[in-house]
Amino acid sequence: MALTERQEALLKQSWEVLKQNIPGHSLRLFALIIEAAPESKYVFSFLKDSNEIPENNPKLKAHAAVIFKTICESATELRQKGQAVWDNNTLKRLGSIHLKNKITDPHFEVMKGALLGTIKEAVKENWSDEMGCAWTEAYNQLVATIKAEMKE
């Protein structure tokens, strides 16, 4: 289902807030992932030996920022482009990595919950159910693209 103009506006409005602190929000995203599913730390080599989010870990900072920025930027472009706009190599890499790490629906759901929680905390009083629905729809579309690549 295509995003509406209103959903796109909500995504872009919240992205303006989020991109002011990508390092902080991306670390918060990972903290919420680990909080919701502690076993997920074993998917990330730089978290395997840690009981908490090591905020000064350069590998975590870099990886978290890339993931957070990729999700958010891709989400804000969905309506305009009509689909996730990743080049073929990026899409193949995303499919391959998720397949290799045996990422399944529950993992994607944990990520979605963490993403929504991070956004809600960041935008504070501007959060609404409508904004949450817009991010949920965008995230689901991005995940569907990755899952399709995982099957190939």
From Swiss-Prot:
EC numbers: 1.7.2.-
Subcellular location, record wording: Cytoplasm; Nucleus
Tissue expression as described in the entry: Root nodules.
Motif Homodimerization per UniProt: ranges: 35-39, 105-117
Bound cofactor: record note: Binds 1 heme group per subunit.
Chief place where the protein resides: cytoplasm
Reported cofactor(s): heme b
CC per GO annotation: cytoplasm; nucleus
Keywords: Cytoplasm, Heme, Iron, Metal-binding, Nitrogen fixation, Nucleus, Oxidoreductase, Oxygen transport, Transport
Globin domain location: 2-151
Pfam families in the cross-refs: Globin
Binding site for heme b: S45, K59, H63, R93, H98
InterPro entries the record matches: Globin (IPR000971), Globin-like_sf (IPR009050), Globin/Proto (IPR012292), Leghaemoglobin-like (IPR001032), Leghaemoglobin_Fe_BS (IPR019824)
Any one GO molecular-function label of the UniProt entry: metal ion binding
Gene3D superfamilies (alphabetical): Globins (1.10.490.10)
Catalytic activity: Fe(III)-heme b-[protein] + nitric oxide + H2O = Fe(II)-heme b-[protein] + nitrite + 2 H(+)
Function: Phytoglobin that reduces nitrite to nitric oxide (NO) under anoxic conditions (e.g. during flooding or in waterlogged soil) and upon root nodulation. Required for general plant development and during nodulation, especially for the onset of symbiosis. Monitors nitric oxide (NO) levels during early phase of the nitrogen-fixing symbiosis and buffers oxygen in functioning nodules. May not function as an oxygen storage or transport protein. Has an unusually high affinity for O(2) through a hexacoordinate heme iron because of a very low dissociation constant.
Binding partners and assembly: Homodimer.
Similarity section: Belongs to the plant globin family.
PANTHER family associated with the record: LEGHEMOGLOBIN-RELATED, NON-SYMBIOTIC HEMOGLOBIN 2
Name of the featured protein: Anaerobic nitrite reductase SYMA
Lineage summary: Eukaryota, Viridiplantae, Streptophyta, Embryophyta, Tracheophyta
